[in-house]
């Protein structure tokens, strides 16, 4: 695996205003995620497509798609998500190298797992692992075989 950026998140005080800004500036397709608020743990979330997607929601040409969400704390900055094959392994490796876990391994149901960390300089980043079974019964963060958490 290349360990490339696979997703980004932009926090906004007024997500609707930010969505309008990016739509008009770059022509991005931005739509409120169906799992938002009611099914997304109360978090308001918009999917941002900077490039077209295929039937699975993956970019159909080079580019990175992401999300836009309501800012949850003052000073919250954009976060890049780096794809890995084994999230648990990379969280352990990052900690050995001096990273701090800010949000432990968490599922995005039917999509994958993520953890947010800060690097040795205090920059926030996230690690992402695709897994269509994430969040399913028996597949919560503490129940997956080999889980570091």
Identify the meaning behind each predicted range.
Residues 1-20, 25, 77-82, 129-149:
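N-terminal beta-strand motif that seeds the catalytic metal site of vicinal oxygen chelate
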């Amino acid at each position: 695996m290349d360990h490339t950026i696979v997703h980004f998140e932009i926090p906004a005080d007024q997500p609707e205003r930010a969505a309008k800004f990016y739509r008009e500036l770059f022509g991005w397709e931005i739509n409120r995620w169906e799992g938002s608020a009611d099914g997304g743990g109360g978090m308001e979330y918009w999917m941002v497509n900077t490039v077209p997607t295929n039937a699975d929601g993956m970019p159909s040409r080079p580019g990175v798609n992401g999300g836009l969400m309501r800012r949850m704390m003052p000073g919250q900055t954009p976060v890049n998500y780096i794809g890995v094959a084994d999230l648990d392994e990379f969280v352990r490796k990052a900690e050995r190298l001096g990273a701090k876990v800010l949000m432990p391994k968490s599922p995005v149901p039917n999509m994958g797992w993520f953890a947010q960390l800060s690097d040795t300089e205090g920059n926030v980043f996230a690690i992402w692992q695709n897994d269509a079974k994430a969040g399913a019964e028996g597949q919560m963060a503490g129940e997956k075989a080999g889980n570091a958490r």
